[in-house]
């Protein structure tokens, strides 16, 4: 049995057509189903529907053989115990710093609000900048507006939400897309099956990219 961990939302919507190219189609709509384990048209493949931030954990611990996770999630929650054989080139966005439009660069210790605490620590450590990291789980744009933080670090797609709140994207930390990740033990135990799936998905990605 091959188990693939996915999260609902944009990643799921963009991944399903790629899996379909490999003949893997869920037997019911994951967006509408309440089930968290969904069979597919291939008897030996099932989907696990989990939180986006939990995908690396399920795969690393072997509860899933493969998964699809954003590079931002892998950077924050760790992808060290996983193989990352393929960039699926879906759910693309940017991980950036942002601040109030026209605000001067703060001097001294910087206050940064983000849910990407580990990424923020590494980023500013590399710059030699002293920072106080304030962990938030949402509505990052609010933090600079009410003087909770000087800057935020967040995923930026169009930038419209930032601009609507008087903020502007500033420094690019990483370009983000969704990656296929594989459990290391599974890759050894089911190498032929998993490699075949990786190759098929790679062809689908390349074909879509050329088109």
UniProtKB/Swiss-Prot annotation:
Q: Which cysteines are joined by disulfide bonds?
A: none
Per the record, the domain of life is Bacteria
Q: Which Pfam families match?
A: HisG
E.C. numbers: 2.4.2.17
Q: Which InterPro entries match?
A: ATP_PRibTrfase_cat, ATP_PRibTrfase_CS, ATP_PRibTrfase_HisG, ATP_PRibTrfase_HisG_short
The entry's localization annotation reads: Cytoplasm
One GO CC annotation: cytoplasm
The record lists the catalysed reaction(s) as: 1-(5-phospho-beta-D-ribosyl)-ATP + diphosphate = 5-phospho-alpha-D-ribose 1-diphosphate + ATP
Give a GO molecular function annotation for the protein. Answer: ATP phosphoribosyltransferase activity
* Function noted in UniProt: Catalyzes the condensation of ATP and 5-phosphoribose 1-diphosphate to form N'-(5'-phosphoribosyl)-ATP (PR-ATP). Has a crucial role in the pathway because the rate of histidine biosynthesis seems to be controlled primarily by regulation of HisG enzymatic activity.
The UniProt family comment states: Belongs to the ATP phosphoribosyltransferase family. Short subfamily.
- Which named protein is this? ATP phosphoribosyltransferase
